[in-house]
């Protein structure tokens, strides 16, 4: 299904379950595609938040929209880890200094009992456990980066090159 079809479904006034997404997007104070650059753990990082807005409690929050071929309501902390979303959540929380939420929208259209098309939608707020796992993954990545590219590099990236035909 085309992303335009999903966007049209989300933005339709007839789609009650996505009213909260429309409210976030239509907030006149929301900042869209907000870039940032910062230093974190001795390295420069850049990011671009899809949306910075206020949530239902009035707190500023970063919203990142994702489409997925899986069923978003089946996601768990291991799914977030396998796609690196925990690292993204950790980095954005550190870079922007505010909470973070993902809104996942399934790509596969489904039909309800009346034949009406819908998509799975799931809002995920990373737990402290997930953020901690993200921090661990970021630190592991920085360790690898330092090993091959840092000032005191101990490995040559060209020596780890493998070429195969499978």
Model regions: which residues?
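Metal-dependent nuclease catalytic cores that hydrolyze phosphodiester bonds in DNA/RNA
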Residues: 1-48, 158-166
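Surface-exposed cleft-lining segments at the edges of enzyme active sites
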Residues: 37-39, 71-80
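Short, solvent-exposed loop/turn segments that connect beta-strands within catalytic domains
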Residues: 41, 56-59, 111-114
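Conserved catalytic cores of phosphodiester-cleaving nucleases, focusing on short active-site segments
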Residues: 47-75, 92
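A generic structural motif
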Residues: 37-39, 52-54, 105
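Short, mixed charged/polar active-site loops
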Residues: 44-46, 60, 119-121
